[in-house]
Regions:
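Accessory DNA-binding and partner-docking regions appended to nucleic-acid-acting proteins
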Residues: 1-9, 357-359, 386-601
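Flexible coil/turn residues that form the inter-helical turn or adjacent wing/linker of helix-turn-helix
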Residues: 166, 228, 372, 422, ...
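Short, charged low-complexity linear segments at domain edges
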Residues: 353-385
């Protein structure tokens, strides 16, 4: 191992004074030649955990990542720091790939990023056997989990690394894994001897908000108005909805782009490039598509449909606020989402074991959505973590929800489901309860039922909330044959007979005051007196990014520019003391940064 201590390298190359959280322990453990399994939330600084030991040890650090779209930016960010980094994946032409292979064999690389399918070829394994390797880093390690939402079969074969190079340390990293998945990762990757480093999964800078669907398009555009000119992601269930949402947002004056697997490759690539390199783009994407977005200044992630699981939700919302600045995770969901997801589970070709797992994951997520306690406490409990007190940064903490005794409305709703034959959807059931005289109610003879018009005391919106919460609590289930009808469950009987009382959450009516508060509370906080200098620095960064054809954040994060604007360094020595500026960036960009600070006074 090289004699350069980790701290010296951290300051000299990366420009940071100190490691964060468990980073130092992980770096020293791996640099000493030991295996590690690292669970750390997005934005926690996972990449430093393998980059620093790779630079401390002799040889090249081999980073295995499934996110091809990310590799180019990750490598460019390292080059900006003066690190000799390259990547090998299917996007490179033969000539470039051959050059990278020559540099690998000649010992001219510090870091090499490679896709798992490329790594596992006989040709590449042969190249590695002729190279000096510092370590193997297996990123996105949850991809090895068969039950996970990102399963990649090639990850199962990565045990070959330990079989062929037992003396080379391996570090596997993931930002999302509940305790069973953690055990599966260790087992499948042959990391029995690895030390586990498990950080808190909390992302304190993200505010969590859940709203009930009630004109979803208007709710989304109202939410986005509090994030004008900020970058964000809007997740939708289907490709069609992605495109419709992007079109709608454009008509509302937002700079929105679509992104899903059905778009032509060049359109996808161009939209992703624009999202990464331009400010204030809203990317509308499918939940199923892993975008591999490493943009640090994503200020919000909005879900217009319910994700399938807590892990999926955590991973998708985790793309917000990677720079540590305030960000928002906003979820808009209604009964229709629940009906659709439950039908998808029942109609799938999966085994009964798999279906049961999917059901419990969905029920867990519904519990989060309907909970009246701190969102953060519920979210983290799903990862086996206890959060000690209410967080003060979620909708339930900021505006505690009211509860109401819904026992009688619940009995009326369940009775109406039973008496109408357990095969009708919510819209029709509400019409019956509220005494509607429409054609369908009369045609079915439901105006003659004892439950007809017994629910006129509640409006349709409240009845939708009652039915939604009954389904979420498994007191009603969705007809899996595809018609979306509701029927009773075994648990319904206790409510109907009065043995079980029902308390429900009273849905909040969205108000603009809440949006204004939201606008004040999230986003990058720059003091008014620093704004002109901050914007001038962003202008220089945009110019440098265009010249080099790289995303702006690869050159400097917003938070670094804000620190410069606050501290106003007028010499290179003073600039060197601002966090996030390593030696290479200081010599490369320092004079121009200092010049702008002096000009702006």
């Amino acid at each position: 191992m090289a004699s350069r201590p980790a701290h010296d390298l951290l300051q000299r190359v990366f420009g940071y004074d100190d490691f964060r959280g468990p980073q130092q322990d992980i770096v020293e453990h791996v640099a000493a030649g030991h295996d590690a399994l690292v669970l750390m939330p997005t934005g926690g600084g996972k990449s430093l955990c393998y980059q620093v030991p790779a630079l401390l040890r002799d040889g090249v650090g081999i980073v295995i990542s499934p996110l091809i779209a990310l590799m180019q930016d990750q490598v460019e960010a390292l080059r900006q720091l003066g690190v000799r980094a390259e990547y090998l994946n299917s996007t490179l032409d033969a000539e470039t790939a051959a050059r990278v292979e020559r540099e690998l064999l000649a010992g001219e690389l510090d870091m090499l990023y490679v896709a798992p399918e490329r790594l596992l070829t006989g040709r590449f394994l042969s190249l590695l056997s002729r190279s000096q390797i510092a370590l193997f880093a297996i990123d996105e390690a949850h991809c090895v989990s068969q039950w996970g939402h990102d399963f990649r079969p090639e990850y199962r074969q990565l045990t070959v690394l330990h079989e062929r190079w037992p003396e080379i340390p391996r570090i596997a990293l993931t930002a999302t894994a509940d305790p069973p998945t953690q055990r599966e990762i260790a087992e499948r990757l042959d990391l029995a001897e690895a030390r586990h480093f498990v950080s808190s999964f909390d992302r304190p800078n993200i505010r969590y908000t859940v709203v009930q669907k009630d004109n979803a398009r208007k709710q989304l555009s109202d939410f986005l108005r509090s994030h004008r000119s900020e970058a964000g992601i809007v997740y939708c269930m289907s490709r069609r909805k992605v495109e419709e949402t992007a079109e709608f947002l454009c008509t509302q004056g937002f700079n929105a782009l679509p992104y899903h697997a059905g778009l032509p490759a060049e359109v996808r690539a161009n939209n992703q490039r624009r999202f990464l390199r331009e400010d204030g783009i809203v990317m509308c994407a499918t939940i199923a598509f892993g975008m591999g977005i490493d943009k640090p200044d994503v200020r919000f992630v909005a879900h217009t449909d319910l994700p399938k699981s807590m892990e999926g939700y955590y991973q998708e919302t985790g793309r917000a606020g990677r720079d540590g600045e305030a960000a928002e995770a906003w979820l808009c969901y209604g009964l229709g989402d629940v009906v659709l997801l439950k039908q998808m589970i029942e109609q799938s070709e999966a085994s009964e074991e798999r279906k049961q797992l999917e059901r419990s994951k969905l029920d867990h997520l519904l519990g989060y959505c309907e909970s009246m306690q701190c969102r953060r406490q519920v979210l983290l409990a799903g990862f086996g973590e206890t959060y000690p007190k209410p967080c003060g940064n979620c909708d339930n903490c900021l505006t505690p929800p009211a509860a109401w005794d819904a026992t009688i409305p619940a009995q009326k709703a369940l009775s109406c489901v039973y008496r109408s034959g357990q095969r009708f959807g919510v819209g029709h059931l509400i019409d019956v309860l509220r005494g509607s005289e429409n054609e369908k109610v009369k045609q079915q003879g439901h105006d003659k039922l004892s439950t007809y018009a017994i629910g006129r005391d509640l409006d349709a919106r409240t009845w939708r909330s009652v039915f939604r919460q009954l389904v979420a609590a498994s007191l009603l289930e969705v007809d899996s044959e595809g018609h979306g009808g509701l029927r009773l469950t075994d648990a319904s009987r206790d409510v109907l007979t009065g043995r079980r009382q029902i308390s429900m959450r009273r849905d909040a009516v969205s108000a603009s005051t809440g949006r204004e508060r939201s606008a004040q509370r999230t986003g990058l906080s720059v003091l008014p007196q620093d704004l002109a200098l901050f914007n001038a620095l962003r202008g220089l960064r945009a110019e440098l990014a265009r010249e080099q054809n790289v995303p702006a954040f690869v050159i400097f994060h917003d938070s670094t520019l804000r620190n410069i604007a606050e501290q106003r360094p007028t010499s290179l020595d003073e600039l060197a003391r601002v966090g996030g500026i390593g030696g290479t960036k200081l010599s490369r960009y320092g004079p121009r940064l200092v010049e702008i600070v002096r000009e702006e006074g």
